[in-house]
Structure formats: C-alpha cells, structure tokens
Amino acid sequence: TAVNWLKEQNLGEYNIIHIQGVMGSAAQVGRTAAMNEMAEAEGWTIVKQQAADWNAETAQQITQSVIDSGQDFNVIYAENDDMARGAVAALDAANISHGVDGDVVIMGFDTNKWALEEVLAGRWNYDGQCNPYQASYIDEIIQKLENGEEITEKTIVMEEKGFDAKTITQEDVDTYGI
C-alpha cells in the first residue's frame, strides 16, 4: 500500500500535508484510515489534514497555507491525482523542490496517465492505483445474485498497484494510465 511505500523511504522525519478527498467517500475513508494508522504507529507528524474535495485549486490553497505558516513539511499525501497536482502548483510557485531528490515527496492516487507521466519524469515520487475493475466485478456479482446464481468465492482479493519514480517504466504508464 501507499503508506507502506512511504514508510520504506526511511525519511527520518515525516512531516505530512494530508489532503483529503470528499469526506465520507470510500476512497477518502480508506486512504485517510491507512495514513492515520501508519502515522500513529510510526510517530509521524501530520502538519495539516484537510479536505479539498478532489479539487486541485483547493489543494493548492491548503498547501499554500502551510507554506505561508512557515511549518516544516516534507511529504504531500494527496488522496487523488488532481489534488496532488494542485499541491505541486503551490510548491512550484514557492520554488520548493519536489519529486526524486527534491525536498518534498509527492504522492497521489488514481493513476491518471498524466500523473504517471509526472512519476516517470521524477517530478512525483509515487502514484497509487485502486483496481479500476472493482466496480464492474462487483456489478457482475450483484447481477449473479439477482439472477439466483450462487457465488462460490466468498473472499475476493483485487490487486492494487503503486508506481514509484525509481522503478516506473513507460510501459507502466501506457498499460495502467487511465
């Protein structure tokens, strides 16, 4: 998972701006729970945790407010790619380096093709993918149940992928970018 990847970076200090999606949505709940649990377990500091409702401009404003406050931070954990893009816009405007060998680690989610290209170029560090076939697979199960068919598999594990700037390839961008 994304937070495990972040832990493996061994940053020494973790001062995180956590930009959340629409509160109560499945993606927000899951991504926030993962971050909060890891931050508590590892003693990470969440400098700011605020909802941007999947909006790039709001994410940019949240990030700018932290920059203006003078608080130290070295991780942007944005719960979707658009919000990560907004956060990066604030960093760029303030001439704060980010990505591979930068001062701030950038993490997004959803594996939009343009976002994976940012990872490939080293401007972002990580982009996570929740399996895009989950919805269609769940719909298929519901239809089977509605038709009276029995579902034999009680547990289904869907693979999730994460793309790291140090290992991503152009083939990954072409295959997994949406």
Give the label of every model feature segment:
Residues 1, 26-45, 62, 86-90:
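Short, solvent-exposed amphipathic alpha-helices that sit
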Residues 1-14, 59, 111-115, 130-147:
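Hydrophobic alpha-helical segments within soluble ligand-binding/sensing domains
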Residues 13, 46, 72-73, 124:
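Local beta-strand N-terminus motif with an aromatic residue
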Residues 13-20, 36-56, 159:
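Short beta-strand elements in bilobed, periplasmic/extracellular small-molecule ligand-binding domains
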Residues 19-23, 27, 37-38, 130-178:
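Hinge/cleft segment of the Venus flytrap/periplasmic-binding protein
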Residues 24-28, 52, 56, 77-80, ...:
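Solvent-exposed, acidic/flexible segments
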Residues 35, 48, 52-117:
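Hydrophobic alpha-helical
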Residues 121-128:
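Rossmann-fold dehydrogenase core element
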